[in-house]
């Protein structure tokens, strides 16, 4: 019987040699255009380096990622004809995936400028615990806190 081939995962990006930057590039990518996505992300990192001269852009990115990543979320479960929102702890891989998704979403929703500028602004805001993506994380945490009474219904 043939052995099952396991996927290689995400390779680190070329400039920073960091897997999480590569995952952000993959999250920003549309229609398979990875070069365009990489140009957007690296442009955002250059903008961060220009505006925050005292800090490394990779450190700002990591701090933004940790500030946006949710620790708990609510999941729906049907119990006896009623649907409850049950707070659940978020696994590390999903935590990062949600953070990338929210950063991209709220960067896209910002007004006017180029995507690199919008992404840089969202990352800098998230690093300083401001911005829409951090508000989304806080909202998810509030929902989990409000439904703490249903925690005993865990899956």
Curated annotation (Swiss-Prot):
One of its GO terms (biological process) is translation. This is Small ribosomal subunit protein uS7. NCBIfam families: rpsG_bact (TIGR01029). Coiled coil: none annotated. Belongs to the universal ribosomal protein uS7 family. One of the primary rRNA binding proteins, it binds directly to 16S rRNA where it nucleates assembly of the head domain of the 30S subunit. Is located at the subunit interface close to the decoding center, probably blocks exit of the E-site tRNA. GO terms for cellular component: small ribosomal subunit. It comes from the Bacteria. Keywords: Ribonucleoprotein, Ribosomal protein, RNA-binding, rRNA-binding, tRNA-binding. Part of the 30S ribosomal subunit. Contacts proteins S9 and S11. One of its GO terms (molecular function) is rRNA binding.
């Amino acid at each position: 019987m043939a052995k099952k081939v396991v996927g290689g995962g995400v390779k680190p990006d070329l400039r920073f040699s960091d897997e999480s930057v590569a995952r952000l590039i993959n999250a920003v990518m549309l229609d398979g255009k990875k070069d365009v996505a990489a140009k957007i992300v690296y442009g955002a990192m250059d903008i961060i380096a220009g505006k925050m001269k005292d800090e490394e852009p990779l450190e700002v990115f990591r701090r933004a990622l940790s500030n946006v990543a949710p620790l708990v979320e609510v999941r729906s479960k049907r119990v006896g004809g009623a649907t409850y929102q049950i707070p659940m702890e978020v696994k590390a891989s999903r935590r990062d995936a949600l953070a990338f998704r929210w950063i991209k979403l709220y960067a896209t929703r910002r007004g006017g400028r180029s995507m690199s500028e919008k992404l840089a602004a969202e990352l800098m805001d998230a690093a300083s615990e401001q911005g829409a993506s951090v508000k989304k994380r806080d909202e998810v945490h509030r929902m989990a806190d409000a439904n703490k009474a249903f925690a005993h219904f865990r899956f």
